[in-house]
Design a protein with these regions (language model features):
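N-terminal, post-signal peptide beta-strand-biased segments of exported outer-membrane/organellar beta-barrel
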Residues: 10-127, 419, 445
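Bacterial N-terminal signal peptides
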Residues: 2-9
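Outer-membrane beta-barrel porins/channels
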Residues: 15-28, 32, 37, 101, ...
Length: 505
C-alpha cells in the first residue's frame, strides 16, 4: 500500500505537459501574440522583431502565478477512514505557487538584422504541496477497511473497521531557458529567423506515507498497522510450527499478515533531478500594410534526468518506485511546438490577432524507459487564440484576449498528481508609454478549467493489492462485484498577475 501511494504520486509528477507560452506580460494582456510585432516577439514571433525600429530594446518582466489542483474522488472504502465522516467521496486539493517569475527579452535591431536574447521559464515552474495526499494515496490504505472484517471473522477480536494515515507530497520543478537567435529582413515584407535555446531543468520531490494505523477490535484506540500485522503473522507462525496439521487453514493467513505488514511500513522518497537540453528554433514573418502573417517551429528538447535520491530502504526495495531509485534515468522532454499567427489592422490604432498552436506531445518522451507516458496520449495539444489591442491615445493602450486549450487526455494517462484539463483562458491589461524610451505593461490572466471525469472498475489498481494478500481469485471477485470501482473528477484553477517595463535606446 505504501508503494502504491508514492509510486503513483511521483511517477505522475515526473512527466507532464510542458507547454508554457507565457514569457512576457504582453501575453497576459493578450495571449494571441503569434504575429504581433513587439518585444514579446523575441519569444512568440522572433522573425517579426526585424520590423521593430532600429536600436536596442530591453524588456524586464515579473509575474506571480497561483494554482489549485482539485480531484473529487469516489471510492467506497474511503468511508472507513477515521477522518472521513463515513463518506465515500472526498475532495483532495493541492496548492501550487510561483510568486516570482522573472523573464528578460532583448533585441538589437540594426539595418536588416535583429539579434535577440530571451530568458524565461520556458517549460513552466513552481512548487506544489498536497498536505493530505491524494486519492491515489489514500485509496490504497483504505483497502484495509475491506480486509479488517475478514480478519475479525478468522480471529475474534483481532479485526478492525477504521484506518488512519499520514500522507504528504511536495514537489518543485523549474525549467529555465535561454534563447539566442537572429532574424533577417529579406525585404520590406518578409523576414526569417533562426535561433537556439538552451534549457536547464531541475526538480525535487519529497513524499511520505507513514503512521498507518488501524482500530484493533473495532474500538476507538488505534495501533500501528505494520507492527500489528507483523505480530499476528509471528503468532500464527508459532501456532503453525506447533501444529503442522493446521497448515491448510493457517498458511494463507500467515501470508496475508506478512504481506500486510510489509505493505503498511513507512515509506519516504526524496529525489532530485537535473539535466540540460537544446532545441533549434526557426520562424518566418510576412508583413503588409494591413495584415501580418507569421509562423514558428520549436524543435523537441530532449531532457533525460538521472536521479540523485536518498530514499528509505522500504522505497528502494519496491519495484513500483524504480523510476526514482538513485541513478535511474527518466525522460521529461519538452515537446516540439508549431505556431501560426495573423494580425489585422482594419483601422488606425486597432490590432486584431488570431493564433494557433500545436504541441507534439505524443512524440515527447516522458517517464521511465519502456513505460513512457506520452505513448498513452491520443495526439498533441491544440490551442486557439484571439485577441485585440487598441491605442486610446499616444500614451495608453488597452488589450484583451482569449485562449482555448484542448489536451489529448485519455483515462490511461490521467492521474491525480499529473493532470491538466481542457481550458479557456482570458487575459487583459494596459500599456502606458511614459516617453519614447520607456513603456510599462500590466496584465492579469485567468484560466477556467473544464472537469474531466474518469471511472475505473479497479480503482487505482486496488484489486492488485488485495490479490497479493488474499490471492488472485479474491481480487478477481472484487472487480466482478464492483467492490473496488471508483471515479475521479479532475479540475484546476489558475491566475497570473504581472508587470513589466520595456526600454528602448
Amino acid at each position: 500500500m505504501s508503494v502504491a501511494l508514492l509510486g503513483a504520486a511521483l511517477t505522475a509528477t515526473a512527466g507532464g505537459y510542458l507547454t508554457n507560452t507565457n514569457q512576457n506580460v504582453a501575453f497576459l494582456r493578450n495571449p494571441a501574440q503569434d504575429a504581433a510585432i513587439n518585444l514579446n516577439g523575441v519569444y512568440s514571433n522572433p522573425a517579426g522583431v526585424s520590423f521593430l525600429k532600429e536600436g536596442f530594446h530591453l524588456g524586464l518582466n515579473l509575474q506571480s502565478a497561483y494554482q489549485t489542483r482539485e480531484v473529487t474522488s469516489k471510492f467506497a472504502p474511503f468511508a472507513d477512514g477515521a477522518n472521513n465522516n463515513n463518506r465515500d467521496t472526498k475532495l483532495f486539493k493541492g496548492t501550487a505557487s510561483a510568486p516570482i517569475i522573472p523573464s528578460v527579452q532583448a533585441a538589437w535591431v540594426k539595418n536588416r538584422w535583429a539579434f535577440q536574447f530571451n530568458f524565461a521559464l520556458v517549460g513552466g515552474g513552481g512548487k506544489a504541496e498536497f498536505n493530505q495526499g491524494m486519492g491515489s494515496f489514500e485509496s490504497q490504505v483504505a483497502l484495509l477497511g475491506m480486509v479488517g472484517p475478514k480478519i475479525e471473522a478468522d480471529h475474534k477480536g483481532s479485526g478492525f473497521n477504521k484506518y488512519k494515515v499520514d500522507a504528504y507530497m511536495h514537489g518543485k520543478q523549474y525549467v529555465f531557458g535561454t534563447t539566442l537567435g537572429a532574424s533577417f529582413r529579406v525585404n520590406d515584407h518578409f523576414s526569417v529567423y533562426g535561433g537556439l535555446r538552451g534549457v536547464y531543468a531541475t526538480a525535487h520531490y519529497y513524499g511520505h506515507l507513514k503512521n498507518i494505523q488501524i482500530n484493533q477490535g473495532n474500538g476507538a484506540n488505534f495501533v500501528p498497522a505494520s507492527g500489528y500485522f507483523g505480530f499476528v503473522a509471528t503468532t500464527l507462525k508459532g501456532v503453525l510450527a506447533a501444529k503442522p496439521t493446521l497448515a491448510s487453514a493457517l498458511a494463507p493467513q500467515v501470508r496475508q499478515m506478512t504481506v500486510l505488514s510489509e505493505a503498511t511500513k513507512d515509506v519516504t522518497l526524496n529525489a532530485d533531478q537535473h539535466d540540460f537540453g537544446f532545441a533549434p528554433i526557426v520562424g518566418a514573418h510576412f508583413r503588409s500594410k494591413y495584415i501580418d502573417v507569421a509562423a514558428k517551429y520549436e524543435f523537441r528538447t530532449a531532457i533525460a534526468f538521472k536521479n540523485e535520491s536518498a530514499n528509505s530502504e522500504s522505497a528502494n526495495n519496491l519495484s513500483a518506485l524504480a523510476a526514482y531509485r538513485d541513478g535511474a534515468e527518466v525522460r521529461s522532454d519538452i515537446p516540439a511546438l508549431l505556431t501560426f499567427g495573423v494580425q489585422v489592422r482594419p483601422v488606425e490604432g486597432l490590432r486584431l490577432n488570431l493564433g494557433y498552436h500545436h504541441y507534439f506531445d505524443k512524440q515527447a518522451k516522458s517517464g521511465l524507459k519502456g513505460a513512457y507516458r506520452n505513448e498513452l496520449l491520443n495526439a498533441g495539444t491544440k490551442e486557439y487564440l484571439f485577441g485585440a489591442e487598441y491605442d486610446l491615445n499616444k500614451s495608453w493602450e488597452v488589450s484583451a484576449g482569449v485562449q482555448r486549450t484542448e489536451y489529448p487526455n485519455t483515462d490511461a494517462y490521467m492521474n491525480d498528481l499529473s493532470f491538466t484539463t481542457n481550458s479557456t483562458s482570458l487575459g487583459l491589461g494596459v500599456g502606458y508609454r511614459v516617453n519614447d524610451m520607456v513603456k510599462v505593461n500590466a496584465g492579469y490572466f485567468h484560466t477556467f478549467y473544464d472537469t474531466y471525469h474518469k471511472e475505473s472498475a479497479n480503482y487505482n489498481n486496488a484489486a492488485n493489492l488485495i490479490g497479493a494478500a488474499q490471492g488472485a481469485e479474491a481480487a478477481k471477485a472484487l472487480v466482478q462485484h464492483g467492490a473496488v470501482k471508483g471515479s475521479d473528477d479532475f479540475t484546476r484553477t489558475n491566475k497570473v498577475f504581472g508587470v513589466g517595463v520595456e526600454l528602448t535606446f
